[in-house]
Amino acid sequence: MTKTYSTEIKIQNVRGLHARATANFVKVADTFCSEIYVTNKDGLRVSGKSIMGLLMLGAPLGSILTLEANGNDAEKAIKALTELVDEKFGEAV
């Protein structure tokens, strides 16, 4: 039985959800079988496994996004992606 998990994430790195951060997000998301979606405050919902989709969200520092995963490893996906965002995508800045 698959479950859906969701949480809100806050973009905390100075440059926001830019190309390198987005690539890191997709790299982690791709390790999971679950469907992963990210939605911005305007309701734009994109695949968490699409660099172009994530860039379309236009998420600068401080943006609140909804992260949703549906599948057998959805809970693990949400946890890993939330940690990545909380760690500012591994960027030193």
What do the predicted segments below correspond to?
Residues 10-60:
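Compact, glycine-rich, soluble single-domain proteins
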Residues 61-93:
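C-terminal structural segments of small proteins and small subunits
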Residues 1-4, 43, 72:
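Short, glycine- and charge-enriched coil/turn segments that flank and shape catalytic ligand pockets
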Residues 2-8, 64-66:
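Intrinsic-disorder/low-complexity, polar/charged segments enriched in Ser/Thr/Lys/Arg/Asp/Glu/Gln
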